[in-house]
Amino acid sequence: MFNCDVTAIDLTPMPLFSADNMTTAFLSTDTSVVEKSLFGIPEWLLQINDDISRALERGVNIRQLVSARACVIDDLLIELFKCFGLDKTDLALFATGGYGRGELSLHSDIDILLLMPHDINADTSSKIDNLVALLWDIGLEPALSVRSVSDCLEAALDHTIASALLEARLLIGNDALQNVPHQIVNNQWSPRSFYDVKIDEAKARYLQHNATEYNLEPNIKTAPGGLRDIHIIGWVTKRYFRVSKLYDLVQQNFLTEKEFDELSFSENYLWQIRHYLHELTGRNENKLLFDYQREIAQLMGYDTQTDDQPNAAVERFMRDYYRCAMQISTLSEMLTNHYYETIIEAQLPDEERPKKQPINARFNQVGDQIAMAHHRVFAQHPESILEMFLLMGQYGIKNVRTHTLRALKIAARGIDQAYRDNPTHQTLFLANLKEQNYLFHRLRTMNRYGVLGNYIPAFAQVTGLMQYDLFHRYTVDAHTLFLIRILHRFTDPHFYEDFPLVSSIFQRIERKEILVLAAMFHDIAKGRGGNHSQLGEIESIEFCLAHGMSTADANLVGWLTRYHLLMSMTAQKKDISDPEVVTLFADLVGNVTHLNHLYVLTVADMNATNPQLWNSWRATLMKQLYSQTRRILRADIDAPTNRQDMISATRKQALVMLDNVDNQHMNRDEVLRLWDDLGDEYFLREIAEDILWHTEAILNHPPIGRASNADSPPLVVLREHRELALDAVQVFVYTQDQVNLFAVTMAVFDQMNLDVLDARIITATRDFALDSYVLLDRSGTLLVDSDSQQELKQRLIDAFKNPTAPKLTHKRIPRQLKHFDVATTINFDFNDASNQHIMSLETLDQPGLLARVGQVFLQQQIEVHAARITTLGERAEDMFYISDQNDQALSADKLKTLKTALIDSLSVRNDRV
């Protein structure tokens, strides 16, 4: 049984009612009489919830409160059971599941079982129906099962029902049935079969949540590190030890007092979050959505934030949640494995038990696990903490026996400055980073059991640290370890096709630990304020020098830490078709060694930041920047080094491709004449493959391709671009240039629910627009539906032929975006070479954003010459090359007016935009 002492909580007493007047009134056909028969119970239940909330505000322990609500429901169900005469039958009423454990949050499911030794007769069935109807009328909405013992035997073959029966607790009724639910589970499931099915269930559950505790909107019940991870410990052990409470496992010497305290503390923390989720939503809500994170942070006392750090409170709250989740998932994994190793393995035949083989005097290999040779290994040989992980890499061992993990967790607390300063320990730590085999798994275990955070205290500070945005999908520590895992994948032939250039470069780098160290430190100074890259540079150099690395190697790690964002920002935010941009980047990089390391680190970093961030488009940008920079740094005499050289090189490459394909529809002379009309800018911005596609489309569209007729119809062609992103579509437009072309195009895309990933807007020498777009289809039908393709083409053609002010659609801002405040910032830089202003726009990403920008450009008579579209989570960071309608630079007054108009247009934050 559980603790039912509710005296300290001051709960409102249950209303008085009797069996006679309740059943008589309830069976009446008079609605008013039935309402009176509820005797204020619905209002009382609401008051109980309010009493519990007030008690939590007073500081009453949440564990008492979830037990108190279970007690209240116990009392109510027992009285109602009597009121309907069910206590005079052979029925037994059980609380099952979480309610059976005595754990009820404000709106938790109330799982009950009505059990009979035989089939239920008509009279009893009628009474049960009336009871259930009343329970729904008073607002309990129970999850009710009515079963005979034989029914229960069959139902228990479902492991989820078996789990609920393990928690069954008799409330009232037939005492002879008290132990039947537990006996049924014991009869239907062996310890091994039940363990296996629950572990498989946990693995499937983990996969549903991306196998990480660090989701942006975690489900605190079912996600890794959620309440279910505590429940599974109870399920697999209660089946064997025949105990009812988690603390009983301490008395069985299965669980230590320290582990029980850690589980209890973490469970209390999750229960408190769950209480507030239920209170705020008025329902059984377990998903910690952005909608509730800020308010719950405040309710739980995380109220420290400043104007320059508006997300400080919610980030601290989520950091504590993620740390709690990691502790729960770590303990759950360790304890379920401990159950297998101590209980299941002991029942296996000798030939099926893992064999022990000595590695050295301190460690053995047991099957596919490593284990300390005796329980004093870490105490007598502190260096063995790091030695163990090195041996795992050298011997290809991925896992650790649980008795060793328990000892490791205790030993890790002894890692102090003296330990870190020990040359033997420093050598072992660096040796671990040099050993690539299972490096991610070894570092992950180091992190989960406290070794990494104690050896590098700054790493402990970022453990669980999440930035409150949609761009960074993982905590800093998880992101760092994922980055290192991706680095290792660059050596795996299975991933070579995804990263051909990066893989070849990485495999040629001899000192791979340089990149691993840069990965370890690149985000280590986040959350402190200031420039985290510069702070991380200082710490990384100090760490490397303290570990005996050369000054050159330490400086390389520091340089990579400081400039780890340089390449991605240059490729995504600047015009890398401009030789001056590439030359400036090359000057900052300095040499090919820096470039190779930075390229590999950047690709891994982008892949580890957000699974949706890396795509073929970004890969192409990065590869283009790398290749152009490498030519400059190597002073390659055959490489294009200026604008005209780059144009010539692109044309030459496109001609080679033209000669290698079936080009019977394209005459070479016509191709060259067309290319002369397209202008230099086109060959700076487009790649050879797309040039070939555009050329064929134009030449097969005679009115434009062969006559350059100003009255010719617009050309719109589409093709699949699945390499870029799922459901991505390339659209190429060739039409007479006009001032509102960008605006009407964006409006059409918005009307058809198409998101713009990339845009290249170019004007040919004969005043024809050559516009290329990469679109993401929100509905997912454009690639497979010819009618949708034709509709898009026709809408664009009609819009180009009848260029009026575009009509904007009004769509709801997605739920997640509503919780982020991204200030709209606009800056202008003047480009002397093009006589254009480069407008950078940072704002909240929202439906119809580019359509609204286009409308402002139209109203302000702005000509758009090129655009770079970048979406980073909730933040849009776009660049536009603009002038007035006469291709002249904008005046200072015009820039000010444009900026004001854009900010006014984009500052609308309603349910609809």
UniProtKB/Swiss-Prot annotation:
It holds the Pfam family GlnD_UR_UTase. Its EC number is 2.7.7.59, 3.1.4.-. Its cofactor is Mg(2+). Residues 1-358 are annotated as: Uridylyltransferase. GO terms for biological process: regulation of nitrogen utilization. InterPro entries: ACT-like_dom_sf, ACT_dom, HD/PDEase_dom, HD_domain, NT_sf, PII_UdlTrfase/GS_AdlTrfase, UTase/UR. It catalyses: [protein-PII]-L-tyrosine + UTP = [protein-PII]-uridylyl-L-tyrosine + diphosphate; [protein-PII]-uridylyl-L-tyrosine + H2O = [protein-PII]-L-tyrosine + UMP + H(+). Disulfide bonds: none annotated. The keyword Magnesium applies. One of its GO terms (molecular function) is [protein-PII] uridylyltransferase activity. Residues 730-815, 838-913 form the ACT domain. The keyword Hydrolase applies. Keywords: Hydrolase, Magnesium, Multifunctional enzyme, Nucleotidyltransferase, Repeat, Transferase. Signal peptide: none annotated. Residues 359-729 are annotated as: Uridylyl-removing. Uridylyltransferase (UTase) activity is inhibited by glutamine, while glutamine activates uridylyl-removing (UR) activity. Residues 476-592 form the HD domain. Modifies, by uridylylation and deuridylylation, the PII regulatory proteins (GlnB and homologs), in response to the nitrogen status of the cell that GlnD senses through the glutamine level. Under low glutamine levels, catalyzes the conversion of the PII proteins and UTP to PII-UMP and PPi, while under higher glutamine levels, GlnD hydrolyzes PII-UMP to PII and UMP (deuridylylation). Thus, controls uridylylation state and activity of the PII proteins, and plays an important role in the regulation of nitrogen assimilation and metabolism. Belongs to the GlnD family. Has four distinct domains: an N-terminal nucleotidyltransferase (NT) domain responsible for UTase activity, a central HD domain that encodes UR activity, and two C-terminal ACT domains that seem to have a role in glutamine sensing. This is Bifunctional uridylyltransferase/uridylyl-removing enzyme. It comes from Psychrobacter cryohalolentis (strain ATCC BAA-1226 / DSM 17306 / VKM B-2378 / K5). The lineage of its organism: Bacteria, Pseudomonadati, Pseudomonadota, Gammaproteobacteria, Moraxellales.
